[in-house]
A protein has these predicted regions:
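N-terminal, positively charged regions that mediate nucleic acid binding
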Residues: 2-62
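A structural signal for small-residue-enriched, beta-sheet-centric alpha/beta enzyme cores
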Residues: 2-14, 48, 58-111, 115, ...
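Phosphate-interacting basic helix/loop segments used at nucleotide- and nucleic-acid interfaces
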Residues: 20-36, 118-135
Length: 238
């Protein structure tokens, strides 16, 4: 475990457009960071929106017709979980259960909607590989997005893609502070790091990338965000 984490938003990213080389842009911004260069063991958290923009995951919708957005949400879903008014909870092609299939109208031009990246693990790996090649450091990369929670109000950022950092840290079989063996404890470490990073990025500050420093060395490994998706046979509410 770690007893100290520090996090800061990376400034100077600017507006991202389709076909921009996001990894190169992030590296350039990190070179100019007043907090100093990236170090081995840092974690880069990158918001889904800039990843989707760079990868061209933008589609045109009719902003005057609510049915246009609704149809797009349904097209991006493999299953409709719940409906209430304009809100639709869906399961996406990635296995995520979230509002509106992750289709987002915020921070994009009117008449556009941003879709989730096709493969956010791959997106994270690309950024990680560019950082490694250009800066010579080994970092973890998390692609984050904002999700609601079924049983609690409010939004929080979670991981939808990872590279070089665990999605889940399995503590089953280890002892707690009183020596009892833990039977079910699996920590969603990538989600926790994504949430920590969101505190220094915000929703409207124009800072889409953050660095988290101080992660436990044991968290770094090759992984996939699919580790966070609960299998249907284990889901009590499906």
């Amino acid at each position: 475990m770690t007893t100290r984490l520090t996090a800061w938003g990376v400034t100077g990213i600017g507006e991202i457009k389709p076909d921009d080389q996001l990894g190169d842009i992030i590296v350039a911004a990190c070179r100019n960071e007043p907090n100093g260069p990236l170090l081995d063991g840092d974690v880069l958290v990158v918001t889904q929106k800039v990843v989707s923009k760079a990868e061209g995951q933008l589609v045109a919708i009719d902003p005057t017709n609510p049915l246009s957005h609704k149809q797009l949400v349904e097209d991006e879903a493999v299953r409709i979980v719940r409906r209430r008014g304009d809100l639709i909870i869906t399961e996406t092609k990635h296995g995520f259960v979230c509002a509106n299939s992750g289709v987002d109208l915020s921070n994009v031009e009117r008449g556009q909607a941003a879709l989730l990246p096709k493969d956010s693990d791959r997106s994270a790996r690309r950024i990680r590989d560019i950082v490694r090649a250009q800066l010579g450091v080994e970092v973890g990369v998390i692609v984050s997005d904002t999700f609601g929670r079924a049983w609690r109000k409010g939004l929080t950022d979670v991981a939808i893609g990872v590279a070089g950092i665990a999605a889940v840290v399995d503590l089953r079989g280890t002892a707690d502070a009183l020596g009892r063996v833990m039977q079910v404890t699996e920590v969603a470490i990538a989600d926790e790091l994504a949430s920590a990073a969101e505190l220094v990025m915000g929703k409207s500050s124009g800072i889409p990338v953050a660095v988290v420093r101080g992660a436990d060395p044991g968290w770094f490994r090759e992984a996939s965000v699919s580790e966070l998706v609960r299998p249907p046979q284990e889901d009590l509410f499906r």
